[in-house]
Amino acid sequence: MGRQGGLYKKDDMKRNAFGACVLAAGLAMGAAGAVDLVLAPDGEVRTPAAALARARALRASGAVAGRPVEIQVAPGRYHLSEPLTFTAADSAVRFRGASPRAAVFDGGRALAPFTAGADGVWETAVPDGLVFDQLWVGGRRAVRARTPNRFYHYMKEADETCANRAFFAEAADVAPLAQLPPDELARVAVAVWQSWDMGYGHVASLDAASGRLVMKQAMKRPLFFWCATRPRYALENFRAALDAPGEWFHDVKARKLLYIPREGETVERTRAHVPVATSLVVFAGDRARGEVVRDVSFEGIGFEYTAFRIGPTGVANAQAAANVQEGALMGAGVENLSFTNCRIAHTGAHGLLLRAGSRHVAVRHTLVEDLGAGGIAFGGDNPRDPAKAAGVSSHLVVEDSIIRHGGHTLQAGIGVWIGHAHDCAVVHNEICDFFYTGVSLGWTWGYAPTVNRRNRIAFNRIHHIGQGALSDMGGVYTLGDNAGSEVANNWIWEVNGYAGNGAPAWGLYTDEGSQGLVFRDNLVARCRDGAIHQHYGRENVYSNNLFLAFSKAGAWRSRAEDHVTVRVLNNVFWWTDPDGAAWRGGGSFASMRDIVADGNLYWCAAGAVKETAFKGADWAQWRAQGHDARGALADPLFADPAKDDWRLRPGSPALSAGFRPFDWHAAGVYGTDAAWRACAEERCWDAFEDAPKAPKYRRERLRADFERFPVGNVPHTMGAFAPLDANPGRPGRLAVVDADPAQGRKALRFADAPDLKPDWTPIVTAACGVEAGVAKLAFALKVEDGATPTVELRDYSGDEPFTVGVRLTVQKGRFTANGRDLCAARPGVWHDVALALPLSGPRAGRWSLTVTPRGGASARAEFASFLDARFKALTWIGFICYGATSSVWYLDDLRLDTEHD
């Protein structure tokens, strides 16, 4: 039974059919050199740790000088329960094996043979004290018992008392947990999805009658943060969920492993493998202290089976699974480290994780697959002071490698993640089958200074990304200033995100603050939501690309800026969906003046390009605004689109518009090794399939007055998301205070500060769901001098990532609504704010706003339309700090009611 679109895939046999991709033979070991040590299962030196200690002794004795100690690794499996740890004293070592399938560093252990029960469930004994959250059976990853077997359960209602870790479930969905004893209930894990990440929380308590479930682990955002549809979750790790082939359950009390076999498995030939070591190799360098691990290389070595423990409370969600600092191979402070013709497989968390102060690292001709999280994560500190300069990482090369099948445990893992690093190259790789992004660059939100420079992502095949599980992703995804960086000659296809809450998915995605990037000569095809997305940024260039077979829009620009955000030049946009558009995104058509578009060719193969294809405007209006003077609406004359033959026939109008043909088949692995190429071509993923449409979330009434929260706390009513994790030690925060509330005894204080990440924090959000009638929202607001609060009312239910109906701000001491000046904001005085928003009927869209300072006269304004005409429902209320200065303001007495005729 399948797992498509949820935490697991439906055909684990195909995903993990490693035998079909085995290299026929290892690469030659290169020019013969001196062998100083032989590591062999039956030799004098039998363990990797003993070999490393012997190498250290050889170097200390002076027997080896001026070159690395050569350690020949004989075929065999070398079992590690603890990682092989390199310090600076272990520099200049080379481990060389004949083949990564023959010489394997193994972090797991085999259990006793299975016995088959009459009910078809196999079992085997588990040694006392052995605890694990991953399992492999017959070399293939098995699935921890889970319900539902495919796709998701949906949370019914938010719990306002504990919005980040509690919710109300449908009673039938949690009924199987009702009879569990407390110790078994505490081991049940709740998998939670939130747009671009997911996490786990073990059950703290359950009220089966009401369906109220509380997790021990809080998620980083309120569970109903995205609220157009009900949030997703699944339940794992209890006996009643064991009901499908390939699933397993560890009965801790009975010390037994229970397993339902997959087709073709027999007890005589099938063994279970349990991971023991969390890492196989650790590089314990510290560049700031002058302790650098240098000149270490591995050739022809396999690294298999590592564990990731979800822990007694769970593990919080985080973009790119960046909160999980565990990898099969991991460390910091390395220099001249290389992996050639290696294999990293069957991991609990990331494959290779190298952090602060790692420089000149090469991964070549290496297979990285079957990953609990991401493939390769590389990056260090982003120093704002010179004292941290040693933490900067640089000069990573990932070349001619295959990185695939990630996110088995932590779906937000990325194929290759590069953050706070410069002069890196990811070239000629096959990167596929991840639930989140393929390659990521950056890791600074907004326009703050970064160390990211001259990074190159080129000639990669990146495909089958997203798989319908997460959102707000890209085949290539960037953040922050990346001056001098280039994304070129990549072939990207099938990037598809979750179709429910959260932002969509794109082929190329320049997210918050991206600047200085050039995207050229890329082929981006069949990315449902769109080919490219510019959130906000500065001077990014998309030039000479093929953007093909998208459904919603070729290009998106979300936030208007007062400078050039993006240049889109000499590209071909070609789509087949008659409802597809060339351009979409935030703001009005008039706001599109921050982009430069010219020389682009647009064509809808299903018929005429619709009149609203250019951000709601037609071609003539688009050109009248100054765009695409050299562009055209014309068939590019592809050779055979039905067969993905995107060559241009003679006379193509794309050529006269300035497009230069390029060979997208040059992307991917290279060389003469036929087996390596065949491995890259192997189809080991499932066909994409969307989850069923999630039920809508309807909440028409809300109350929040902060009275029940202790002074100094961050409230989780409505869902409060403060930048406490993202900005440790920074002054920006939320807190309940008892000084001068609008009513009662308490209010909520917002304190903004410069350089907070993300730049829209602190923030408080309220999930709701009003589609009809009149939504009546009221709250009290008090500002201090210089404060610039923003209140946004959003609709997440449409085709856009979201639309904004109302944006109320305080700027220069004045209340402004949707750009219209209203009245003065008196410092230190509470203002009662009331909005009435008709969402249906003859007055739909004609809304009103009243602001009344305490002790003063009211100011009232009527509006004929919402900020965005596509705003149709109120699903999200946000109180946001967009400011970049130190400022303070207060919120109290939030109320939402809905009137129906």
Question: Where are the language model's segments positioned?
Answer:
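Extracellular polysaccharide-degrading/modifying enzymes targeting complex plant/algal/animal polysaccharides
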Residues: V38-A345, R384-A389, A624-A634, K643-R698
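Glycine- and acidic/polar-rich repeat regions and solenoidal domains
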Residues: V281, F308-G331, A345, A349-R359, ...
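Extracellular beta-strand elements of beta-rich domains used
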Residues: I301, S401, N571, N600, ...
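Extracellular glycan-recognition surfaces and repeat-rich motifs
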Residues: P710-R749
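Secretory/extracellular carbohydrate-interaction modules
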Residues: P741-K812
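Carbohydrate-binding surfaces in secreted/extracellular proteins
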Residues: F779, P827, L835-A864
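Short, aromatic/His-centered strand-loop micro-motif at the edge of beta-sheets
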Residues: F815-A834
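Flexible glycan-contacting loops in extracellular carbohydrate-active proteins
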Residues: R860-Y890
